[in-house]
Amino acid sequence: VKATLKTLAVCAALAVSGLTQAQDIKIANIVELSGPGTTAGTLFKNGVEMAIKEINASGGILGKKISYTTEDTQTNPGVAKGLTQKAVDNDVFAIFGPVYSGSIMVSMAESKRGETPNFTGGEAAAVTAQGNPYVFRTAFGQSISFPKLAKFINTKAKTLAVVYVNNDFGKGGRDTLTKLLEGTSTKIVADISTDAGQVDFSAAVLKAKQTDADAIFVYTNEEESARALREFRKQGVKKMLIGETTLTGQKVIELAGEAANGAMAHVGLTVDAPQFKAFGEKYKAEYKSESDHNGIKGYTGMYVLKAAIEKVGKLDRKAVAAAIRGSCFSTKQTPGILMDVCFDDKGDLDRESFLVEVKNGNPVINATLPALNARK
C-alpha cells in the first residue's frame, strides 16, 4: 500500500510539474475593477485577456501557453502595491497594470524588486522618471503626447483656461503643458483644480467660463470628463474644449451624450483609426461593448511582451526587459502590436497619433501626427 501511495504521490507531483511547465508564462493582471478607475481598469484587463486568448490559440510564446490571474486594486495605491508584491512572490513572468498613475507610482517598487516587467496604462510624466528599468508604458507618457498637443493649442488659442484633476495624472499633465506653453503665443489665464471622483463641476466650469479664454483644456479621468462636458454644455460654453485621450474616449461619449459633440483631443489610441478598427470589432464581438484606448493599451502591451520574449529567445525576465528598452517593434514582425512602436531607455513609447473631434456622437479623426521622434 505504501509503495502504491508513494507511486501515486510521485505521479501527482509529476502531473503538477507538467502542468506548470505547460503554463509556465504566468501573467498577473493588477487593475482597477472597482472605485473611480473601474472603466479604465476593466477595459485594460479585457484587452490583455483578448491578446492572451489569441496568442494561446496560435501556439503560445516559444511553444508555451500563457496563464493569468486578475486582481482588483480598488483604485487604491496601497492595495496595488500589496497585490504587486504578491504577484512577484508568486514568480509571475510579467505584470499588467495598474492603469492609474497614482497606483503604478507606488506599486512599481515591488515589480522592480522582483525584476519583473511591468506594463502600465499610467500616463503621468513621473512614472518613467524614476529610473525603474522594468516599467513600460502601453500609451504615451505626457512627455511624448503633450509636445504634440501644445503645438496644436498654439495654432488655435491665444488664451487658455486649464481644468485638471488633482491627482498624479492630472497634476502631471497640467505641469507639463504649463512648461511647454511658457514663452509661446498661448497664455494660460486660469488654473482650475478638481477632485478625483468629483460629481459637481458647476463651480469649476463657471470659473473657466468667466475667463473668456479662447479655449479650455480639460484633463480629468473618464467619468469626470463626461460630467465636466455635460456641465460645460449646460452653462452654454461655446469655446473650444480640448484635451487628451480621456476627454473623447468611448465611455466618455456614452456618459456625456450630446454634450460630447465638439470636444477635441490629441489621442494616441482610438478604435476609430484604421489601424485599430479590426481590434475594435473583435473586442465588441467578445465583450458586447465598445473598447476605448484602455482596451488597446492592454492588448498591444501583451503583444509587445510576446515580441520581446521572441526577440530574446528564452524566458528570462531581465533579458526581456532589456530587449524592450531602446528598441522598436513592427507590425510586420508582430501584427498584434497594431502600430509600429519604439521604446526609449526609460520605458516611454513613441508612435503616430491622432487629432480627434466628436461629431454626432462619434470620434472623427481630423489629422494623423507623426511620431514625436520619428526615425528617418
Sequence positions of predicted segments:
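Extracytosolic ligand-binding ectodomains
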Residues: 2-11, 22-376
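Sec/Tat signal peptide C-region and signal peptidase I cleavage site
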Residues: 16-22
